[in-house]
Amino acid sequence: MATTITPGIVSDWTLEVAAYTDGTTPTTFTRVYGITDFTPPAPSKNLEDDSDFDSGAWGSQTGTGLSYEMSGTVKVPRAGLAVDPGQEILRLAGKSVAEDGYVHFRAIKKGATTGYTGIADASFTEGGGSRTDLTKAEFTLSGRGELADYTPAP
């Protein structure tokens, strides 16, 4: 018997950020609004070849480290209009280095009981285009340390 799966939608994700605070978890996070495209965080493994002559023709790999990245695109307000506070945290971190370029983040799907939290190095780049294109920016958050589970308050 086939089971029907009702798919989720990418717009179920919510991203919240906070300026980096020397590793101390902030008490206040700011939601990033205007997201039009989002790739949630997912661990990827660094694999190293650990095969030897005894394995014959078969190779073997083992994971030696984990990393993660998330990215997205946001609509950017016109000049002179109010900026989105969450986007502003990403923009300021995106033009800074070392600790000033880090942000705390939380990412969770609507209706989910757990999400992700961590610290990431941020990039934020406004895009160009033709005269009729909307102003958008791309952001990337590259993980620094553990991608931890996050349980939101009920």
Predicted regions mapped to residue ranges:
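Acidic-aromatic/histidine active-site loop/patch
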Residues: 138
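Solvent-exposed edge beta-strands and adjacent loop segments
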Residues: 2-78, 117-135
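Extracellular/virion structural assembly segments
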Residues: 55-118, 132-135, 145-154
